[in-house]
């Protein structure tokens, strides 16, 4: 039940507060933001000391696609097949960087949603079906993976794309 979860979460937060007194031990807890909402959370002395240190780990759409590009830029390619790096250079005229053995996309590729949309449309198609009635893959994917607060986790985003790619290969 929600009450038992709230008590467990309060216990976790109280432990985090206790460990603040140890100089060389810093605990971190990853908690879904929706679990921190409600009057029953943080009803113990000095709860605000723990709750005010919360950091938002949300991933906007541009960052999710930037993560996808990073993943694809560094993925191995099949023998004789052009990889994502070649596609970015030849088709999209993107300048890529190689730093310590890791490929990086351009700032435009990682932050500009129009550039990201055009790249993703080449990979996935312009429409979900044969026309726009079923939606556009660039917006459809994050919208359908989002939770009630509009948040998408990088793991579910990449997993959905991996599953779609494997399904396409079959």
What does each model-found stretch correspond to?
Residues 2-132:
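The catalytic "switch" region of P-loop NTPases
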Residues 117-170:
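P-loop NTPase catalytic cores that bind/hydrolyze ATP
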């Amino acid at each position: 039940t929600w009450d038992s979860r709230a008590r467990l979460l309060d216990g976790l937060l109280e432990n985090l507060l206790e460990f603040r007194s140890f100089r060389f031990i810093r605990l971190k807890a990853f908690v879904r933001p929706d679990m921190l909402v409600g009057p029953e959370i943080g009803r113990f002395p000095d709860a605000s000391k723990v709750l005010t240190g919360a950091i938002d780990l949300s991933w906007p759409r541009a960052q999710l696609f930037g993560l996808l590009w990073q993943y694809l830029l560094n993925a191995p390619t099949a023998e004789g097949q052009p990889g994502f790096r070649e596609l970015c250079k030849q088709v999209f005229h993107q300048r890529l960087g190689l730093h310590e053995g890791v490929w990086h996309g351009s700032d435009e590729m990682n932050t500009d949603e129009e550039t990201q949309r055009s790249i993703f449309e080449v990979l996935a198609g312009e429409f979900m079906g044969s026309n726009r009635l079923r939606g556009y893959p660039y917006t459809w994917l994050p919208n359908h993976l989002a939770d009630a607060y509009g948040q998408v986790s990088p793991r579910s985003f990449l997993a959905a794309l991996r599953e779609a790619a494997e399904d396409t290969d079959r």
